Amino acid sequence: LSCRHLDVAADGTVIAGYQFEGPEWESHPLICRLDTDRRFSELTLDDELTASLNHYIASVAFSRVSGNVLVTAPRGNRVLLLDAVHGNLVANLALPDAAGARCDGTGGFLVSSGQGGLYRVAPDLAIPELLASLELRWDNHLT
């Protein structure tokens, strides 16, 4: 198990994403949280969703407008939006090879794809909007 990426909210809350390199048949939480009282917890998603992430969270980005945090799972082609206070799943969106993530300042997020796409995830949680398709390969960083 290794910590791959993290982000820190304005209030000091930390959310981090893991990579689990154990046996494929084992399952482990892939997201953890350190709150402002220094309480550490791992966020548990349902087993089917956790398995679909294929043991890897790539990027983490807090919204600077809402109480949400977005995490990307490129191996599972997923973007998850979580309530940063309680860790509850707000949205589970399909996005191919979702890699980098960053808040856009309006309550939404920008997400890059390892396939060259740059997407916007709007605050209304509609299907991610393709902003650009480029002849390049994004990795896990947009900052």
Predicted segments with their positions:
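Hydrophobic core register within WD40 beta-propeller blades
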Residues: L6, V60, A101, L142-T143
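Short coil/turn segments that connect the beta-strands within blades of beta-propeller domains
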Residues: D11-T13, V65-G67, T106-G108
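Beta-propeller blade signature
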Residues: H28-D37
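Blade-level signature of beta-propeller repeat domains, shared across WD40, Kelch, NHL, RCC1
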Residues: V111-T143
